[in-house]
Amino acid sequence: MRIDGHTRLAAVVASPIKHSISPFIHNLAFEKTHVNGVYVAWEIPESDLAETVENIRRYNMFGINLSMPYKEKVIPFLDGLSPEAQLIGAVNTVVNRDGRLIGHNTDGFGFFASLKNFNPKDTHIMILGAGGAAKSIVTQAVLDGAKKVSIYVRPQSLVKAKENFRTLLDQTDCYLEFHDLTDADHFQKELRQTDLLVNATSVGMDGESLPISIDTRFPKELLVADIIYQPFETPFLALARKQEIEAVNGLGMLLYQAAGAFKLWTGENMPTGAIWQELENIYNS
């Protein structure tokens, strides 16, 4: 990687963020595409967010990525939002267009790009969880033409979940339903008619917990996905694979959301195949 007077900067902004794999992904992409850029991690307090965004203009940066807790808090400092970022109400990528800062959200795009043989159009999808990741995935599914999306949460979270998806409910005609995750009978019944089941919660990061009953039976044509990539195989994915069901972890989502941001910044396609091999060497060891 060369750094000279023409090198442009990109960064990921969050707190905490020093653990992030994003600098590894993007700097490898800059190197392999011969784009003169460098990517760093900025761990900042909220009081520095406005100035950090202004620095994108000041230093003619490509832009920034954002993670928690700034995906929503950054919006007032931007000049505009992409359609998906408007629907989600959160931004993970800011693009500098000649000094005009536009917020995008590539999380949903990244998720579906990681499912190589799955097209959301006219499908029935079940999502576990209603947080930021779930909202990004559901929004992208709606934009891509999903027929029905069912969102499963704990009973005490049902009211909040519906409110969290209010904008999407008001502005789209996709059939969205909200259900109690503890109702195992209803869950199993709907699962028989479902094309894709997604765990969009953090349950399973400990390598032990399951977000659903261990007695759940998966239909043979189902695709199962988890947004978690550490551990490489969660108990949720292990349950699916034990039943010989195709199962995908969250490492691809991490890579392809980065690829979406890289394309917006540089106009270049990230060499995802080569970078995927490097990531697998790190996480599947």
Swiss-Prot record:
What positions constitute the catalytic site?
A: 71
Q: Which residues form the signal peptide?
A: none
Q: Name one GO molecular function term.
A: NADP binding
Q: Which UniProt keywords apply?
A: Amino-acid biosynthesis, Aromatic amino acid biosynthesis, NADP, Oxidoreductase
The record's top EC class is oxidoreductase
Q: What EC identifiers does the entry list?
A: 1.1.1.25
Q: Per UniProt, where does NADP(+) bind?
A: 129-133, 227, 250
| Domain of life, per lineage | Bacteria
InterPro entries recorded? Aminoacid_DH-like_N_sf (IPR046346), NAD(P)-bd_dom_sf (IPR036291), SDH_C (IPR041121), Shikimate_DH (IPR011342), Shikimate_DH-bd_N (IPR013708), Shikimate_DH_fam (IPR022893)
Pathway-wise, it operates in:
Metabolic intermediate biosynthesis; chorismate biosynthesis; chorismate from D-erythrose 4-phosphate and phosphoenolpyruvate: step 4/7
Which residues does the record give as shikimate binding sites?
20-22, 67, 92, 107, 229
Q: Which reaction does it catalyse?
A: shikimate + NADP(+) = 3-dehydroshikimate + NADPH + H(+)
* Gene Ontology terms describing biological process: amino acid biosynthetic process; aromatic amino acid family biosynthetic process; chorismate biosynthetic process; shikimate metabolic process
Q: Which Pfam families match?
A: SDH_C, Shikimate_dh_N
Q: How does it assemble?
A: Homodimer.
What HAMAP family does the record point to?
Answer: Shikimate_DH_AroE (MF_00222)
Describe its function. Answer: Involved in the biosynthesis of the chorismate, which leads to the biosynthesis of aromatic amino acids. Catalyzes the reversible NADPH linked reduction of 3-dehydroshikimate (DHSA) to yield shikimate (SA).
What's this protein's family per the entry? Belongs to the shikimate dehydrogenase family.
Q: What protein name applies here?
A: Shikimate dehydrogenase (NADP(+))
Say which species the protein is native to: Streptococcus thermophilus (strain ATCC BAA-491 / LMD-9)
